[in-house]
C-alpha cells in the first residue's frame, strides 16, 4: 500500500482541526488518536509524524505531546456532530498514514464511530471510499455531504 502524502495531510488537517473549544478537549482528541495509533502493537514513524502534526495544529506543546504517550484517559465526549465527524476522519487518516491498514484498526474505528454516535453505514461507506482512493484522502466536503445525506 502506498504511503499518504504528509504535505497533503497537513493541508487537509488545517481544514478539519478547528472548532475545539478547550485545551482539555484537544488533549482528549490527541489521547484517543495515540491509543488508536498503537492498536496494532507499535507506533510507526509515519504515525508519529502525523500525530506530531496534529498536536501542533491543535496547539499542544511538544513536551506535553510527548507526555501524552505515558497517560491513559477515557476520551471526553465530543459534543457536536461536526466535531465527531472531524475526529472520525482524523482517525481514518491515521489508519492509512503508515501504508498499512490492520484488521484491528478497521474494527476499532468502526466501534469508535458507533461510540461517538455516528451512522455505521456512512462510516463504512467513507472507509470504503478511502480504501478505493489511490491517495486514501477524501475531500472533507465529500465526507460532510455523506453524513448530511443520512439526515435526509
Protein language model features and the residues they cover:
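Small-residue-enriched hydrophobic alpha-helices in membranes
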Residues: 1-36, 42-152
Amino acid at each position: 500500500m502506498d504511503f499518504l502524502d504528509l504535505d497533503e495531510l497537513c493541508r487537509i488537517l488545517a481544514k478539519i482541526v478547528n472548532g475545539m473549544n478547550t485545551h482539555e478537549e484537544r488533549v482528549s482528541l490527541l489521547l484517543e488518536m495515540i491509543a488508536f495509533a498503537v492498536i496494532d502493537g507499535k507506533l510507526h514513524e509515519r504515525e508519529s509524524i502525523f500525530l506530531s502534526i496534529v498536536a501542533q495544529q491543535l496547539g499542544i506543546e511538544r513536551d506535553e505531546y510527548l507526555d501524552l504517550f505515558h497517560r491513559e484517559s477515557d476520551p471526553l465526549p465530543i459534543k457536536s456532530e461536526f466535531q465527531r465527524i472531524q475526529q472520525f476522519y482524523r482517525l481514518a487518516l491515521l489508519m492509512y498514514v503508515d501504508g498499512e491498514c490492520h484488521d484491528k484498526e478497521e474494527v476499532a474505528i468502526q466501534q469508535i464511530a458507533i461510540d461517538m454516535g455516528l451512522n455505521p453505514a456512512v462510516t463504512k461507506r467513507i472507509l470504503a471510499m478511502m480504501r478505493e482512493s489511490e491517495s486514501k484522502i477524501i475531500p472533507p466536503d465529500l465526507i460532510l455531504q455523506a453524513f448530511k445525506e443520512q439526515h435526509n
